[in-house]
């Protein structure tokens, strides 16, 4: 529990000293849910409108309100499969119905066509989604309870796979 306290103290520092809006918690499913429940409750006493995003998809992350949103990884992989014609587009409809039943109404889902992991390891949305990239981008904005993620350079149509561990600057855009 000493590690838990130290982590919660560090998070509270960022809230009180730097007024951050919230936290993106990497691989949240690998941390005990009890930590997230206790820490979220503690942090929301300091900042009631705190936003907690889990880089995970497990339903139990929402049971006691630890998180506000989580990544929609299954939807992301379905979009890739639809774009590559490995599955029918109706799979996305079926996903939406199932997702609605799987998560509480308050749970937001981070909808994305790319992020730092996908872009670096599996290619840009141009290479993964091809001609379907624009319609899939629109889809991330209209999916129920969706919270669209615009990843680096997507707002300008930048087609590039970034190096994960090396400096890889974005060219100046005018």
Please describe what each predicted stretch is.
Residues 18-19, 146:
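Short loop/turn motifs at secondary-structure junctions
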Residues 4-7, 36, 133:
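Aromatic/hydrophobic pocket-lining residues that form the small-molecule binding cavity
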Residues 121-128:
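Short, solvent-exposed helix-loop connector elements
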Residues 16, 26-109, 130, 139-142, ...:
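Active-site-proximal helices and loops of the catalytic beta/alpha 8
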Residues 1-12, 16, 24-27, 56:
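Active-site mouth of glycoside hydrolases
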Residues 150-156:
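Short acidic/histidine-rich active-site segments
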């Amino acid at each position: 529990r000493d590690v838990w306290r130290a982590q919660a103290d560090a998070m509270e520092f960022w809230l009180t000293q730097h007024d951050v809006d919230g936290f993106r918690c990497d691989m949240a499913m690998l941390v005990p849910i009890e930590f997230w429940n206790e820490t979220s409750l503690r942090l929301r006493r300091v900042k009631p409108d705190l936003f907690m995003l889990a880089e995970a998809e497990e339903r139990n992350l929402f049971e006691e309100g630890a998180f506000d949103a989580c990544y929609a990884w299954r939807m992301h992989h379905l979009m890739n499969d639809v774009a590559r014609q490995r599955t029918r587009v109706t799979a996305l409809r079926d996903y939406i119905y199932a997702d609605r039943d799987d998560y509480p109404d308050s749970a937001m889902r981070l909808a994305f066509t790319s992020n730092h992991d996908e872009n670096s390891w599996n290619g840009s949305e141009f290479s993964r989604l091809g001609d379907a990239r624009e319609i899939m981008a629109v889809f991330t904005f209209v999916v129920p309870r969706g919270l669209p993620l615009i990843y680096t350079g997507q707002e300008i149509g930048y087609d590039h796979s970034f190096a994960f561990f090396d400096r890889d600057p974005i060219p100046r855009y005018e």
